[in-house]
């Protein structure tokens, strides 16, 4: 089915890119392009340059692409007026096509459930890829720092092509002091300077809106400065370590429900410090109790792609310090 072909496409990525731009791809597209106002292309961005030259009146749109290819694709969207847009798969994570995008660690047990390829996870939290896209699109001027999970340092994940990173926007990894961290910085700049507690860790050129640093974890403030060609600071972004105290923080989206049996209230549940700073290394079981006859628990879970837990139970493990409950 679909999951099988997606898995094959992941393995054959470079070959698929080459083949979609070849003569067979041209013949396959020709009839459809003649019949349609706009030709939709899935994972065929290798066609953009040649088709724009060969068929200048052909309207095209990238109907399904990978986030890692966005810098290449968006450059061509801006260049060719007949290429009207690019749709990255996918915005919100979903059930099915299980784990084809997830960066799976073997220490996680359970059956594959979510696809793991959304730019927003199943609990509604924007992931690093979302901020990367905003920077490429020109919607975010500040750089963004993402840190690969230190609670899995030393493990080699099974990666998926549809999710180009598993970095999280946190510098809170209690118990992992001196562990070598991988920090990814996304920026629309000539170079990036990374500082830890005011001390320069390194400076790197930005390639395809991305620079990667290796730094030993120490609590404090991790700051990325986006620099122009003359080393002038354009903007910066910082991550701060959470405090020692830990709270289980519930943040309901609303406090009143209509008594119609259909109204829902989504409640993010997070392990935080007193200022609401998330602690993503905390992954432990949470048990909920709903009091009163007017409401019931409609669902409870986390964004973990592999789990044997189900959504209609009152207990669930947090994932990256977070879970989501839904009241009806």
Name each model-derived stretch.
Residues 1-15, 301-316:
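Acidic/polar low-complexity surface segments
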Residues 1-262, 274-278:
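Substrate-binding clefts and catalytic carboxylate motifs of secreted carbohydrate-active enzymes
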Residues 205-211, 306-324:
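Aromatic sugar-binding surface patches on proteins
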Residues 218-220, 284, 321:
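A glycine-anchored, Pro-Gly-centered beta-turn/N-cap motif
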Residues 245-250, 288-306:
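Short aromatic-acidic-glycine turn motif
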Residues 267-269:
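Core beta-strand segments of extracellular beta-sandwich domains
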Residues 280-286:
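Short, ordered, surface-exposed loop/turn motifs in non-cytosolic proteins
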């Amino acid at each position: 089915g679909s999951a099988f072909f997606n898995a094959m496409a992941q393995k054959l990525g470079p070959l698929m890119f080459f083949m979609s731009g070849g003569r067979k791809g041209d013949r396959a597209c020709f009839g459809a392009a003649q019949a349609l106002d706009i030709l939709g292309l899935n994972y065929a961005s290798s066609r953009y340059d040649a088709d724009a030259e060969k068929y200048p009146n052909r309207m095209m749109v990238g109907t399904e692409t990978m986030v890692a290819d966005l810098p290449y694709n968006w450059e061509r969207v801006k260049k060719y007026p007949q290429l009207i847009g690019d749709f990255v798969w996918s915005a919100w994570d979903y059930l099915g096509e299980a784990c084809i995008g997830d960066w799976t660690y073997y220490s996680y047990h359970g059956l594959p459930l979510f696809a793991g390829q959304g730019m927003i996870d199943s609990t509604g939290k924007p992931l690093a890829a979302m901020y990367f896209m905003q920077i490429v699109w020109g919607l975010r001027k500040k750089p963004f720092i993402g840190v690969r999970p230190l609670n899995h340092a030393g493990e080699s994940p099974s990666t998926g092509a549809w999710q180009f990173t598993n970095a999280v926007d946190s510098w809170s990894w209690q118990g992992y002091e001196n562990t070598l961290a991988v920090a990814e910085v996304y920026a629309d700049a000539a170079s990036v300077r990374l500082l830890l507690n005011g001390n320069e860790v390194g400076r790197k050129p930005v390639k395809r809106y991305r620079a990667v640093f290796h730094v030993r974890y120490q609590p404090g403030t991790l700051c990325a400065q986006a620099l122009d060609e003359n080393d002038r600071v354009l903007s910066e972004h910082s991550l701060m370590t959470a405090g020692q105290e830990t709270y289980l923080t519930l943040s309901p989206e609303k406090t009143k429900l209509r008594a119609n049996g259909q109204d829902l209230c989504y409640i993010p549940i997070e392990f935080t410090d007193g200022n609401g700073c998330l602690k993503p290394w905390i992954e432990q079981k949470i048990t909920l109790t709903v009091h009163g006859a007017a409401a019931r628990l409609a669902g409870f879970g986390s964004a973990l792609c592999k789990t044997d837990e189900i959504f209609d139970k009152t207990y669930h493990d947090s994932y990256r310090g977070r879970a989501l409950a839904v009241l009806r």
